[in-house]
């Protein structure tokens, strides 16, 4: 499976502090992700992409800057150079291990449409069984927007069509749809996929659930889902961190500082960037996280797969069979010349403490 990272800051950050410099940066994760879902694929090496919103407001009117390549992220000199010379206060980054679709730049995330940016970690169950219904459902405008062959890009087209049918023009230039509109469109997109796959799989004895970790932004608000079409299984990993700053304490080692109650720095990631256990909190399974004006909101996704008992422990059997380890790095002494992924400790993530709206 893939990994993704979101940064939303009150002040801009150099992209290298997210993508290349941290010992457990998303690029190091692409080389050997310990939390990846499918251990039959040793690396997330099927391309990468990074989208960032320019600090110049005139340039940002047409949406984010986008850089993609099919080469492995850890072996792309252009990415390293770009990351050292670029700053942004809103960044989407993604490394891909393909589960559907061929290796091509058009299949690399993130995907953009005017001011909107979208990416996905996971997969749609029996996508071939619902693809025709999905494509027939959306307007030609969004059907023609699809360039690649992934389930993820089709999900984005469905999101755009859903946003349109809710009364919001996806071509809106100012990039401020508001958190309610984006969250509503995200939830309805999940509803469509859940219902269509359930119908397509009704005669199957056993099918794997859909893993729908979606992320979307309009350049202002960010909405992220952690969702699985199962009431008993765990979803793909997702964590968030917030604080007053994200600082490098020594080469490759970073920490989220909390000097006050402000959330000047917010990050959402498939896998944590730091080795400090207290830096990161697991996003609850089957919930939606919203970043609105540097404030985190968490909403449960209440449907047939919602667990009312907050103490209920979902089974890790499916996750373990796919290599999903519901854990985060622990801080410990760093030994020189030892790869970061070989010196980590692991533990279960702490309970979410963000505001539940």
UniProtKB/Swiss-Prot annotation:
Name of a matching Pfam family: GATase_4
Subcellular location: Cytoplasm
Entry keyword Transferase: yes
Keywords assigned by UniProt, alphabetized: Cytoplasm, Glutamine amidotransferase, Transferase
Molecular functions per Gene Ontology: amidophosphoribosyltransferase activity; omega peptidase activity; peptidase activity
Biological processes, Gene Ontology terms: glutathione catabolic process
Disulfide bonds listed in the record: none
The keyword Thylakoid belongs to this UniProt entry's keyword annotation: no
PROSITE patterns: GATASE_TYPE_2
Chief localization: cytoplasm
Domain Glutamine amidotransferase type-2: 2-260
Active-site residues from the entry: 2 (for gatase activity)
Function text: Component of the GSH degradosomal complex involved in the degradation of glutathione (GSH) and other peptides containing a gamma-glu-X bond.
Similarity comment: Belongs to the DUG3 family.
Protein name per its UniProtKB record: Probable glutamine amidotransferase DUG3
Biological source species: Saccharomyces cerevisiae (strain ATCC 204508 / S288c) (Baker's yeast)
């Amino acid at each position: 499976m893939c990994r993704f990272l979101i940064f939303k800051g009150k002040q801009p950050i150099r992209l290298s502090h997210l993508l290349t410099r941290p010992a457990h940066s998303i690029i190091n994760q692409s080389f050997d992700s310990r939390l990846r879902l499918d251990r039959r694929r040793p690396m997330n090496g099927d391309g990468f992409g990074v989208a960032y919103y320019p600090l110049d407001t005139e340039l940002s009117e047409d949406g984010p800057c986008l850089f993609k390549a099919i080469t492995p992220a850890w072996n792309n000199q252009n990415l390293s150079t770009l990351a050292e010379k670029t700053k942004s206060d809103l960044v989407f980054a993604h490394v891909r291990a393909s589960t559907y679709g061929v290796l091509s730049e058009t299949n690399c995330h993130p995907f953009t449409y005017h001011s909107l940016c979208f990416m996905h970690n996971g997969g749609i169950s029996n996508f071939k069984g619902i693809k025709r219904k999905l494509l027939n459902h959306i307007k030609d405008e969004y059907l023609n927007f699809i360039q690649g062959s992934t389930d993820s890009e089709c999900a984005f087209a469905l999101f755009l069509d859903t946003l349109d049918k809710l009364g919001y023009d996806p071509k809106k230039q100012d990039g401020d749809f508001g958190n309610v509109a984006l969250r509503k469109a995200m939830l309805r997109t999940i509803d469509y996929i859940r219902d269509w796959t359930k119908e397509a799989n009704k005669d199957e004895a056993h099918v794997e659930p859909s893993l729908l970790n979606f992320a979307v932004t309009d350049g202002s608000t960010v909405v992220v889902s952690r969702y699985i079409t199962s009431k008993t299984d765990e979803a793909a990993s997702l964590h968030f961190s917030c604080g007053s700053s994200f600082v490098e304490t020594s080469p490759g080692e970073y920490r989220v500082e909390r000097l006050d109650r402000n959330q000047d720095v917010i990050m959402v990631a498939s896998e944590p960037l730091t080795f400090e256990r207290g830096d990161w909190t697991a996003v609850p399974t089957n919930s939606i996280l919203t970043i609105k004006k540097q404030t985190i909101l968490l909403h449960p996704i209440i449907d047939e797969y919602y667990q009312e008992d907050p103490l209920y422990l979902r089974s890790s059997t499916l996750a373990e069979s796919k290599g999903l380890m519901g854990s985060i790095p622990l801080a410990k002494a760093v030994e020189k010349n030892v790869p970061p992924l070989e010196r980590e400790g692991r533990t279960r993530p702490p309970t979410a403490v963000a505001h539940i709206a």
